[in-house]
Curated annotation (Swiss-Prot):
The gene is ssa1. Residues 613-635 have a biased composition (Gly residues). GO terms for biological process: chaperone cofactor-dependent protein refolding; protein catabolic process; protein refolding. It comes from the Eukaryota. This is Probable heat shock protein ssa1.
């Protein structure tokens, strides 16, 4: 059975699962947590990913990157990117219209694309899975918000490539959650299920029908820029104003203070899901001033009222698009950590006339769970639970081309089941027109200027003819990942031209991806080297201390000559002092220093053990690194066998 995994690559947290023996195992990371912060930090000495990165964010706000998902596949001048940049302590710069993240790493200024940062998080998830499954893992299904557009999907796929994954498929988060909900419910009747997925940074609503293992998405809607982070930001602004009112000081220019406040706000927000009030206590927040305050659930709900209300629009849109009345929705499934907010639960319940949402699936893990099932199916798992499962997803946005006068002419309407293929015949609008420019857009507006340009290509060499005579067949083909291929055929000459909409403006080239893959491997090797360097340092330190402790042991004290004890004491003291002054030495230096110390200690320790030694040896065994017994034995004492 192949070791395939499903990864929920979240804005704020990520999660990974594996399906085998008819069940999904959500895999904990090296800290024992089942979700991992989507954070990457760069320091003077190393790169940290996940919990380790988030834990040091207040000390290193400018070089700790989060929210890469809010940048991926977007343009630098996107208004949402511009508004986010006001909240981020790290620096985002522009290159060729794309946003790049700039950090100080090991004393140098480095820039990374959002794809590279996301790939580091994916790599961390992959490593957790490899540790758990015991072996190499490459096959993965990665999830994206249902409302992600073409370039965001493509960029997520690239992030997987950079992390060394074979991305079997990109699937939509609410659809993955629906699998988690429906896998164990084998009712034969058609069930209409509404998935309400509100996470850290994105929001999706999908309506599916589930019947005999067939999961068919009827419609999807959402906002790729709404989630828990936005609620945190409202709290941060609220408390920053309160601090200013009380202390006449503005903390918003101080990245460290704002970060500490944001962490406290996130904690308070979580507390308010179960309590009516939460207190915030931050010592020495700014210029030595302590900040103690509290907030009630009602005040929090008021601060975020408009954001909470906005979550209802996509619900209405999905019901309209799928032509299903809200009374026909059989189950409401809440996914994403932000759905724990009581106000959100009440809004959803009230909208559906008091119907209670399903509480039986874990909102943090459902998406990774479904992705793991889909990954198993794609690598050929045939267990009884998965053999009849079929997933039919939809294109979230209409896809079309620009026709005369800047009109958006859709070929594939939104909520069309994918994979799908559609062709239409167009013609020229001027006499003897030698070529046509085919511009591909996505969006719902009537004019292309209000839609998103995905890419364009030229079909040239059309023989001279009056307008309207040449026949140009344009074909749109959307694959199972929701990624579009477009081709055009001039029927008279048989000339064809095609492009995969790899969003020429936003997409990484093959060369860039190859470069990033090799850099990712280089960073991984550096991380491993840093780990082994620290191990060598710890080894030396614990050896020095265990030597010192051995000499203080009452059983050994009497058997050591004063001069020998002094020699070891001196060597240990020198080693510990050297360690204090050389915290960033190379691995070899630590190993050489350990050999030096062993050179002093081993002959003395051997002498003690030959003279009869302590009963049962030194407590805790020989100090690490000392050979077990006299080197080669000696003539006057008993022969000592070396033991491991």
């Amino acid at each position: 059975m192949s070791k395939s995994i499903g990864i929920d690559l979240g804005t704020t947290y990520s999660c990974v699962g594996h399906f085998s023996n008819n069940r999904v195992e959500i895999i904990a990371n090296d800290q024992g947590n089942r979700t991992t912060p989507s954070y990457v930090a760069f320091t003077d000495t190393e790169r940290l990913i996940g919990d380790a990165a988030k834990n040091q964010v207040a000390m290193n706000p400018h070089n700790t990157i989060f929210d890469a998902k809010r940048l991926i596949g977007r343009r630098f001048n996107d208004p949402e990117v511009q508004s986010d940049m006001k909240h981020w302590p790290f620096k985002v710069i522009e290159k060729d219209g794309k946003p790049l993240i700039q950090v100080e790493f090991k004393g140098e200024t480095k820039t990374f694309t959002p794809e590279e940062i996301s790939s580091m998080v994916l790599l961390k998830m992959r490593e957790s899975a490899e540790a758990f499954l015991g072996g190499k893992v490459t096959d993965a299904v990665v999830t994206v918000p249902a409302y992600f557009n073409d370039s965001q999907r493509q960029a997520t796929k690239d992030a997987g490539l950079i992390a060394g994954l074979n991305v079997l498929r990109i699937i939509n988060e609410p659809t993955a959650a629906a699998i988690a909900y429906g896998l164990d419910r084998s009712n034969q009747h058609e069930t209409n299920v509404l998935i309400f997925d509100l996470g850290g940074g994105t929001f999706d609503v999908s309506l599916l029908t589930i019947e005999e293992g067939i999961f068919e998405v009827k419609a999807t809607a959402g906002d790729t820029h709404l989630g828990g982070e936005d609620f945190d930001s409202r709290l941060v602004n609220h408390f920053a104003q309160e601090f200013k009112r009380k202390n006449k000081k503005d903390i918003t220019g101080n990245a460290r203070a704002v970060r500490r406040l944001r962490t406290a706000c996130e904690r308070a927000k979580r507390t308010l899901s179960s309590s009516a009030q939460a207190s915030i206590e931050i010592d020495s927040l700014y210029e030595g001033i302590d900040f103690y305050t509290s907030i009630t659930r009602a005040r929090f709900e008021e601060l975020c009222a408009d954001l909470f209300r906005n979550t209802m629009e996509p619900v209405e849109k999905v019901l309209r698009d799928s032509k299903i009345d809200k009374s026909s929705v059989n189950e409401i499934v809440l996914v994403g950590g932000s759905t724990r907010i009581p106000r959100i639960q009440k809004l959803v319940s009230d909208f559906f006339n008091g119907k209670e949402p399903c509480k039986s699936i874990n909102p943090d893990e459902a998406v990774a769970y479904g992705a793991a099932v889909q990954a198993a199916i794609l690598v050929g798992d045939t267990s009884e639970k998965t053999q009849d499962l079929l997933l039919l997803d939809v294109a979230p946005l209409s896809l079309g081309i620009e026709t005369a006068g800047g009109v958006m002419t859709p070929l594939i309407k939104r909520n069309t089941t994918i994979p799908t293929k559609k062709s239409e015949v167009f013609s020229t609008y001027a006499d003897n027109q030698p070529g046509v420019l085919i511009q591909v857009f996505e969006g719902e507006r009537a004019r292309t200027k209000d839609c998103n340009l995905l890419g364009k290509f030229e079909l040239s060499g059309i023989p001279p003819a009056p307008r309207g005579v040449p026949q140009i067949e344009v074909t749109f083909d959307v694959d199972a990942n929701g990624i579009l291929n477009v081709s055009a055929l001039e029927k008279g000459t048989g000339k064809t031209q095609k492009i995969t909409i790899t969003n020429d403006k936003g997409r990484l080239s093959k060369e860039e991806i190859d470069r990033m893959v090799s850099e990712a491997e280089k960073y991984k090797a550096e991380d491993e080297a840093e780990t082994s360097r620290i191990q060598a340092k710890n080894h030396l330190e614990s050896y020095a201390y265990s030597l010192r402790n051995s000499l203080d042991d009452p059983n050994l004290k009497d058997k050591v000559d004063a001069s020998d004890k002094e020699a070891i004491d001196k060597a240990v003291k020198e080693t510990i002092e050297w360690l204090d002054h050389n915290t960033t030495a190379a691995k070899d230096e630590y190993e050489d220093k350990q050999k030096e110390l062993e050179g002093v200690a081993n002959p003395i320790m051997a002498k003690i053990y030959q003279a009869g030694g302590a009963p049962g040896g030194a407590p805790g065994g020989m100090p690490g690194g000392a050979p077990g017994g006299a080197p080669g034995g000696a003539d006057n004492g008993p022969e000592v066998e070396e033991v491991d």
